[in-house]
Amino acid sequence: MESVRKAFKEATEKYGCVDILVNNAGISENTSFMDYTEETFDKVIDLNVKGVFNTTRVAAECMVTRGKGVILSTSSMVSTSGQPNGVAYPASKFAVNGLTVSLARELERV
């Protein structure tokens, strides 16, 4: 989270508050479920879910203060259909969907 805060601090000092945030990062591992390790699972979840959470949390601070802003999060069709050989990716994108919809409902009136 500190690296995200630092990057946003530098950007806002130079350019001002963030108007639009696009969460578009993601990784997947092409590994069968039986060969999946907790480390591999955590790597995908950390980037795909925690990355969205951390970046959105910092960007939203400025947006809420100003009373405006747009947050877009890309996901994937496999978030609802699943995919073999990469269970963490669809799970992470399902989590991004839930995070984004919940955040939209919470912040729509702020």
Residue ranges of each PLM-predicted region?
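Alpha-helical segment proximal to the catalytic Tyr-Lys
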Residues: 61, 105-109
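Substrate-binding pocket helix/loop in short-chain dehydrogenase/reductase
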Residues: 32-33, 37-45
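Conserved NAD(P)H cofactor-binding loop of Rossmann-fold oxidoreductase domains
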Residues: 25-29
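Active-site helix of classical SDR
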Residues: 56, 92
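The beta1-alpha1 cofactor-binding region of Rossmann-like NAD(H)/NADP(H)-dependent oxidoreductases
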Residues: 1-6, 38
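Residue(s) in the substrate-gating loop at a strand-loop-helix junction
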Residues: 76
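Active-site loop immediately N-terminal to the catalytic Tyr-X3-Lys motif
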Residues: 34, 81-87, 109-110
